[in-house]
Regions:
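Surface-exposed acidic/polar loop and edge beta-strand patches at domain peripheries
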Residues: 2-174
């Protein structure tokens, strides 16, 4: 291929054997690599700049370790939930406890940043990723469908997210 960027290629496998793909997007000014693991923005390169504009890992293991939050689309609830519980529509729900104390952080081990997203659609300058989270996953109510679109135009990267649920549920991603 002689230096040509492949639009979709393997990035490797998670420790539990799930395949991770990387999607390369390109404009005249920008090249962006998105991963299906956590919808991670893995690499951003601006034409004429010799270094990457983002921090990332060259392999899946990095994103399963200390870089698990780097560049990923986190949720369904980002940050912390004090006490690992919340009342939603009159019912109390319990969430995964973080090792650092009595709180849930970034939706726990089943958060969106730990999931493999599906490639629904792609082109040279965009990709649409989808993810379905089942009712009760991570303690959160509702069957949730999330769509995430990355577009590049010129030197700009735009991310658009939409979500739906069949039940009241907290959704505060980042």
């Amino acid at each position: 291929m002689g230096g040509q960027i492949m639009p979709i290629a393997s990035f490797g496998q998670t420790a539990d054997g799930r395949e991770v793909q990387k999607i390369s997007l390109r404009s005249e000014q920008l090249t962006v690599t998105i991963l299906t693991l956590g919808a991670v923005i893995n690499d951003v390169r601006l034409t004429g700049v010799a270094w990457p504009l983002t921090l990332g890992s060259p392999d899946v293991a990095g994103y399963e370790g200390k870089l698990s939050s780097f560049g990923s689309f986190m949720g369904p609830v980002i940050n912390r939930i004090k006490g690992c519980t919340a009342e939603i529509d009159g019912q109390r729900y319990t969430f995964e406890k973080h090792h650092s104390g009595n709180l849930t952080q970034h939706s726990g081990s089943t958060g969106m940043h730990r999931q493999i997203w599906s490639i629904a659609e792609h082109g040279p300058d965009y990709v649409v990723l989808t993810l379905s989270l089942s009712d009760g996953l991570g303690g959160f109510p509702g069957n949730r469908d999330i769509t995430l679109r990355y577009d590049i135009e010129g030197a700009s990267l735009r991310m658009t997210a939409t979500a739906s649920s069949d039940a009241p549920t907290p959704f505060n991603p980042a």
